[in-house]
């Protein structure tokens, strides 16, 4: 399911999945700016049926940081 997470992030950012891995950080992807961050979060919430608390959004710096919010979905 980690690959599904990467695929969702890639689709939200409009980049190839091969360009991303779990440790890929926002600063490493040009499209992952503040708007891209919101797009990524929205897509993850929709795809996995989860809700990421708004106060935690700023604590997400790389793809791996989404895993705790997915719980048993991954």
Where are the regions a protein language model picked out?
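Phosphopantetheine-dependent thiolation modules in NRPS/PKS and related acyl-activating systems
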Residues: 1-41, 46-74
């Amino acid at each position: 399911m980690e690959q599904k997470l990467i695929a969702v992030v890639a689709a939200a950012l409009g980049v190839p999945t091969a360009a991303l891995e779990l440790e890929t950080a926002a600063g490493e992807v040009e499209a992952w700016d503040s708007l891209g961050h919101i797009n990524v979060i929205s897509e993850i919430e929709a795809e996995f049926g989860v809700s990421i608390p708004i106060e935690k959004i700023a604590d997400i710096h790389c793809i791996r940081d989404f895993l705790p919010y997915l719980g048993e979905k991954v």
